[in-house]
Amino acid sequence: MALKVLPLHRTVLFAAILFLLHLACKVSCETGDCRQQEFKDRSGNCVLCKQCGPGMELSKECGFGYGEDAQCVPCRPHRFKEDWGFQKCKPCADCALVNRFQRANCSHTSDAVCGDCLPGFYRKTKLVGFQDMECVPCGDPPPPYEPHCTSKVNLVKISSTVSSPRDTALAAVICSALATVLLALLILCVIYCKRQFMEKKPSWSLRSQDIQYNGSELSCFDQPRLRHCAHRACCQYHRDSAPMYGPVHLIPSLCCEEARSSARAVLGCGLRSPTTLQERNPASVGDTMPAFFGSVSRSICAEFSDAWPLMQNPLGGDSSLCDSYPELTGEDTNSLNPENESAASLDSSGGQDLAGTAALESSGNVSESTDSPRHGDTGTVWEQTLAQDAQRTPSQGGWEDRENLNLAMPTAFQDA
């Protein structure tokens, strides 16, 4: 089988070689009769190639039997042909390339004409007496036998305005780097300003909370219905089980309806008149006292005691002083003192010396009873109030009411 395949391959290879030899012989036989400037026409005869005039050349090569379709065409740019003939157009001379001035431009029929050497260049003279076309630099020091080098002129090279791609890429990289740096600086500035703002924000928030809190404390005074009543200072002393010389909480007097009515019923903004005490029933008065001191004293004064600064009590005890606002009450700040208010009430009613003495004793009893329980303080204040009313009203009806109230007061406190 292998012997049969091998002769088949040899047969195909031999046939291909014979075909190539036949083609080569045929080509050589067809063109072998024509010379360099001849081509063979359709009849098989050798014909002379066309000749073109100045500035013209054949469109394709002609000779040795080829170039039957060649035609004369103008010379290509930067090429010229001065005479008739079979030759092709020649390239024009470049005067700048040989460091010479250009006197005439190149055309299809004439070559460019170059002049003298550029300043700083000279033409070498050959041994046969001819000079080279190319001008060479004079060098430093210049040759003394060349006149062009003695009048050397310093030339300044003008940079090209067209930037290269490399310069463009470099400029783009530099601009990108600058933009990145500026963006980073901007981000750092924003972060710094934000931190500064966050550091200063707590103090601002505390101020706003203080303003908000003060506004909430004064909200009860903004009610239109309070314009018809005169606000008085309401002073109430409260004794706690804290040690001596404890803090005193200053809170505003929240003159709401319930607190104001209860305060007027018992202590009020100052002491009430004897006529009012005579008109009230001792039993109802006894019932009102625990309710007032249990609800009003604990709820109002204890609720707002934390919102006001601490002040040391010189008498050695914890007292809750409910200050009123002068712009709302229209009274002097001295009215906050229970001694002054009690004295003023007694002086206005009768101006008696005994009433002043009772007021001083009342203030002394309050300061001395700091170690007693809360109900004891309430009873002491109530007894002082009744004593002052009794001194101002020596009438028989007033003494009877005072005795009835004194009898009803211990019973009410024991029930509480």
UniProtKB/Swiss-Prot annotation:
SMART domains named among the record's database cross-references: TNFR (SM00208)
Ranges of Polar residues compositional bias? Answer: 331-351, 360-370, 381-396
Question: Where, by residue number, does the polypeptide cross the bilayer?
Answer: 171-191
Any one GO CC term of the record:
plasma membrane
- Record CDD domains: TNFRSF19
Record InterPro entries: TNFR/NGFR_Cys_rich_reg, TNFR_19, TNFRSF19_N, TNR19/27/EDAR
Tissue expression remark: Highly expressed in adult brain, and in embryos from day 11-17, but not earlier. Detected in embryonic brain and epithelium, and at lower levels in adult heart, lung and liver. In neonatal mice, mainly in hair follicles and neuron-like cells in the cerebellum, but not in the skin epidermis. Isoform 3 was found in embryonic day 17.5 skin but not in brain and liver.
Q: Can you list the disulfide-bonded cysteine pairs?
A: C34-C46, C49-C62, C52-C72, C75-C89, C92-C106, C95-C114, C117-C135, C138-C149
Q: Which Pfam families match?
A: TNFR_c6
Q: Where is this region: Disordered?
A: 321-416
Write the protein's name.
Tumor necrosis factor receptor superfamily member 19
